[in-house]
Amino acid sequence: MSGGGVFTDILAAAGRIFEVMVEGHWETVGMLFDSLGKGTMRINRNAYGSMGGGTSLRGS
């Protein structure tokens, strides 16, 4: 859609900027959930480690 005028060019540029912002935003959200999940796994392992066959006082 070349030659569509200044308004079309501005819309195209704004669309590209928005696309980059959304991609960066979702990448950040993904990293946040990833680290949140790892933290939750670590907490569960510390709290319930004996249930998962880790070191436990049972059977000693």
Curated annotation (Swiss-Prot):
GO terms for cellular component: chlorosome envelope. A bacteriochlorophyll c binds at H25. Signal peptide: none annotated. GO terms for biological process: photosynthesis. Keywords: Bacteriochlorophyll, Chlorophyll, Chlorosome, Chromophore, Electron transport, Formylation, Magnesium, Metal-binding, Photosynthesis, Transport. Its main location: other. InterPro entries: Bchl_c-bd (IPR001470), Bchl_C-bd_sf (IPR038387). The keyword Metal-binding applies. Transmembrane segments: none annotated. It is found in: Chlorosome, Chlorosome envelope. One of its GO terms (molecular function) is metal ion binding. The modification N-formylmethionine is found at M1. Belongs to the BChl C/E-binding protein family. Component of the photosynthetic apparatus. The light harvesting B740 complex binds bacteriochlorophyll c. This is Bacteriochlorophyll c-binding protein. It comes from Pelodictyon luteolum. The gene is csmA.
